[in-house]
Structures are given as C-alpha cells and as structure tokens.
Amino acid sequence: MLLERVLGKNRAWLAAHADEAADAEAQNAFAALAQRRGDGEPIAYILGVREFYGLEFGITPAVLIPRPETELLVELALERIPANAPLRVLDLGTGSGVIAVALAKERPQARVTAVDVDYAALSVARANAKRHKVGVRFFCGDWFGALAGERFELIVSNPPYVAAGDAHLGQCDLAFEPQRALVGGADGLDCIRAIVAKAGAHLDPGAWLLFEHGYDQSGACAALLAAHGYRQMQSWPDLAGIVRVSGARAAQNVLK
C-alpha cells in the first residue's frame, strides 16, 4: 500500500513491473513512509484514507480510525430509516463523519445532522461529506448543547467508551489516536451516561437511540436506559460475536 501511494500505481501495475527499479526520489519517499509505519503509526494516518461501509474516507490524526465493527451501528440505523423517508437523524460525536455520511449516502432522503465538540474533527467530517456529495448539517458542541429545541426520529453515536486506566490505550493504533475521542472517564461510561440522560429531550416518542460501547458494558448500558425510562432495550453482537451496540426506544415519560 505504501509503494502504491509513492508511485501512484495499483498492485496490478506493480506486479507487472516488479523487475523495474524506482528512482531515488521514490525510494526516499518510500523509506520515509516505511519508517513511520515501523514506528507504529497507523497505516490510515500515513495514507490519509480508510474504507468504511464500502466508501473511502479521508482520515487525519484529529479523528479516530474507523473500525469495521462500527458498521454494525450503521446497519442497525439503516434498518430503522425507511427508504425515501425524510427522517431526522442525529449522529453524536461524529468524528470523521463516517457514520453520518454512510447514512446520508444510503438514505438520501434522510435529514442527517452531525455534532462534534472538536473543530478539527468537524473539518474532516465536512470534507468527507463533500467527498461523497451528501448533505449533512454539522454543529460544533458538547452532545446536545448546540441543538436546543431540536428533536429527532433516530439518534446514533459511537462515543468515547474506553476506561481511563485501560492498558490498551498505549498500544498499537490506540497510542496514536486522540485520547479525548477514546476515553469515557474512569469506567468508560461517562459519555454514554450523558447521552442516555439527555437524548430523551431530543427524541420523538418511540424513536430509537443506538450507540456503540465496550465489550463488557452492555449490562451497564441496559441499566442506564431502563433508569431513564426507555423501553424495548436491546443489544447486538458484531460478526465476532462481541456485543457491540445497545439501544432502546424513547417513551413518553423519558426522564429529562
């Protein structure tokens, strides 16, 4: 992949010209990229792109690297957005915008809004919406802070949910990613608590709230949803069998 980037050629071309030597400039450029990779820097940051839900997205160190398991959240959301229905959909903590853009791409009639507290992340998200020619409203704010009086028929989120003391934070890709987008407090649930507590004031009655969480957090998430008056709580496993997403429907008496 690094050599493809340096030479601007695909793998088929490289295979057909395997006996040809690259010039000195290309060799130096490749060596620099290889050094970054050797130092552990994620390939997505080196190349500046990552595929998600069949689409290529621009990625910078200002945002998390999209994971395949997050596609489950997109699939569950799409099941709740009828084709050609102008549903009001909100993506909280949008980061690179992959969830919002994928939903807008798959459901062009949906009215998708995305929020993030970080201006740099929103810049990446806006660029990705432009890249894929979709209309998404973007707001900078802390969860619902910029959305006073607005209500939605579906809210989705992939919030920070890693516990502050998790040893994995200093390993592999996580060591290079923005910690504010990963860490959700001492137990990893601070952001989920805030979302669950406040979402009821922004959901239509019966509307769904869906969010990704850690492998061992589904029980705590179900308890939070129940405590705030949501109904029909459910959790879903990813392709590896790990419970990855939980959600529920808002009721008339959701606690504000």
Predicted regions and their residues:
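Conserved AdoMet
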Residues: 1-79
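Residue-level signal for inorganic ion chemistry
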Residues: 2, 40, 70, 99, ...
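Solvent-exposed beta-strand sheet faces enriched in polar/charged residues
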Residues: 46-49, 58, 139, 212, ...
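Conserved beta-strand segments of alpha/beta enzyme cores
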Residues: 56, 111, 135-137, 231-234
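Conserved SAM/SAH cofactor-binding pocket of Class I
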Residues: 69-168, 194
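Mobile active-site "lid"/loop adjacent to the S-adenosyl-L-methionine
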Residues: 161-191
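Conserved Class I SAM-dependent methyltransferase catalytic core
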Residues: 186-249
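Flexible, glycine-/basic-rich loop-and-beta segments that form/coincide
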Residues: 252-256
